A protein has these predicted regions:
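Bacterial N-terminal signal peptides
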Residues: 15-22
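Domain-level detector for secreted/extracellular nuclease and nuclease-toxin modules, and
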Residues: 2, 26-288
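Bacterial N-terminal signal peptides that target proteins for export
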Residues: 2-15
Length: 288
């Protein structure tokens, strides 16, 4: 829950048993018109709902079922997503295709005039960095192609995009693909675009095209009836402060204070408060 907790606990292994059926109401699917009311999908942060903000969920049909690809809150005035949210479960963790050869393209759900184009990246010295990585969505060709929408792109320095950020993405994919039929890893990713001291600069000095100074992830892992949570915060730089992912870990509460975003607000309040106040690096295999 997005408010300051009176106490913070670091390095404590917390697995919270949830005996209520809180997820039953939380997994309903919403459509792209839900920008004006709270959604119940577990992975989604609280919507900012600013005048220039648009909430979009992309779907695919997989094995005859409608499946959520990923969701985003997109700021049209900054031509950048505030966050991207998705999940790994027994279905979406599958690796049935390789990276798409499809070109980067405009997102059909948002007017192209509100999106960046190729010239905003390479010629400016930045990669077209996926927020929802291509390797995050490999269960079908259609979903992988959706990750190449420009609304899912963020200007990233190549050494960051192919370095420590890629390392974190790979670790998250490993956790996600460890899911069994009763497990789900909920993921939120983003770059900072709202606070001036968290903006690295602007493409061509255009204030509608900020470059994030920091990138983050918020993770919630449901394993059976137990939960754990952790977050990561990385400065967008060519030279990382560390090559160890553990050095970037923090609690969800701490990430909320940095970003001003309320993560996982659809959880039961007591569960949310307990999960977000602390984290244990030992609870996440491969982190230490």
């Amino acid at each position: 829950m997005f408010r300051k907790k009176e106490m913070k606990y670091r390095g404590i292994n917390v697995w919270v048993a949830c005996l209520c059926l809180l997820l039953a109401a939380c997994d309903k699917e919403d459509n792209n018109d839900s920008n004006n009311f709270a959604t119940g999908i577990v992975e989604l942060p609280a919507l900012r709902n600013g005048a220039n903000d648009v909430f979009v969920t992309h779907y695919t049909t997989f094995n005859g079922q409608k499946v959520t690809s990923f969701s985003m809150e997109y700021d049209k005035s900054k031509k950048h997503s505030r966050w991207i949210a998705f999940r790994f479960d027994n279905q979406t963790k599958q690796q049935n295709v390789s990276r798409s050869d499809e070109p980067f393209d405009a997102d059909p759900a948002i007017g192209s005039q509100y999106q960046r184009v190729q010239a905003d990246f390479g010629k400016q010295g930045y990669d077209r960095g996926h927020l929802c990585a291509s390797a995050d969505r490999l269960y079908s060709r259609e979903v992988n192609e959706q990750t190449f929408y420009y609304t899912n792109m963020s200007p990233q320095r190549n050494k960051f995009n192919t370095g420590i950020w890629l390392t974190l993405e790979g670790q998250v994919q490993s956790w996600g693909r460890s899911c069994t039929s009763s497990d789900t890893l909920y993921v939120v990713k983003g770059g900072t675009i709202d606070k001036e001291d968290q903006i690295r600069g602007y493409i061509s000095n255009d204030l509608s095209k900020p470059i994030p100074k920091y990138y983050y992830m918020a993770l919630l892992f449901k394993k059976g009836d137990s939960f754990k949570a952790i977050a990561f915060w990385m400065e967008h730089t060519d030279t990382p402060k560390s090559t160890k992912l553990v050095d970037y870990a923090l609690s969800i509460d701490e990430l909320e204070e940095k970003t001003g975003i309320d993560f996982f607000p659809n959880l039961n309040d007591n569960l949310e408060n307990a999960l977000e106040a602390t984290y244990s690096t030992k609870a996440w295999p491969g982190l230490e």
